[in-house]
Amino acid sequence: MDDTLNQLNPSMSRRQLLNFFTGAIVAATASAAIYPATKFFMPPAESTDAEGGVLAKDKIGHPIPASQILVQASGTRALIAGLAGEPTYLTVREDGTLDPMGIVNNCTHLGCTFPWNPVDQQFQCPCHGSRYDAQGSVERGPANRPLKLVHVQVKDDYIWISSWQETDPRTGEKPWWV
């Protein structure tokens, strides 16, 4: 009888070692390639204040200092990226402050974006001809609802935009967007 124990070979063969390292290199390369792609498709986390507001940003995503907008003439409308990146108009008031009510730049007819016309003192939608006054109320259709409002607040030279949940001051009713 043979007294030697019949053991499996505990050491790894050269082929197994090379397969292991090849798999590890492929996994590391795939992870390195997938990471930037997932970062591209995932939006960055918004910085919010205690009321759930977000910082006003320019078109490339940098926060806009309030002082940059407040140096403009009264009545100027600045277009910024507000809640969920929605284009939002901010207005410089006569006293050199920002109007606490911002107007979201999406037509309530079909969602087109539009410019402020300083000559006519209107928002004019180029898609189907809707017209809105300086406060965002409908002056001419086909749109039948006023423009969405947001709260605007300046804290430490930063502009914070937050959702408007209260009664719409233009209609005296509950906002349609809530």
From Swiss-Prot:
Gene Ontology molecular function: any one: monooxygenase activity
A single cellular component GO annotation: plasma membrane-derived thylakoid membrane
Cofactor note: Binds 1 [2Fe-2S] cluster per subunit.
Residues at which [2Fe-2S] cluster binds: 107, 109, 125, 128
Signal peptide extent: none
TM ranges: 17-36
Cofactor(s) required for function per UniProt: [2Fe-2S] cluster
Domain spans labelled Rieske: 61-161
Catalytic activity annotation: 2 oxidized [plastocyanin] + a plastoquinol + 2 H(+)(in) = 2 reduced [plastocyanin] + a plastoquinone + 4 H(+)(out)
Membrane topology: Single-pass membrane protein
Compartments, as annotated in UniProt: Cellular thylakoid membrane
Disulfide bond annotation, renumbered to this chain: 112-127
Known function: Component of the cytochrome b6-f complex, which mediates electron transfer between photosystem II (PSII) and photosystem I (PSI), cyclic electron flow around PSI, and state transitions.
Subunit structure: The 4 large subunits of the cytochrome b6-f complex are cytochrome b6, subunit IV (17 kDa polypeptide, PetD), cytochrome f and the Rieske protein, while the 4 small subunits are PetG, PetL, PetM and PetN. The complex functions as a dimer.
NCBIfam families: Cytb6fFeSPetC (NF045928), PRK13474.1 (NF010001)
HAMAP family from the UniProt entry: Cytb6_f_Rieske
Similarity section: Belongs to the Rieske iron-sulfur protein family.
Name assigned to this protein: Cytochrome b6-f complex iron-sulfur subunit 2
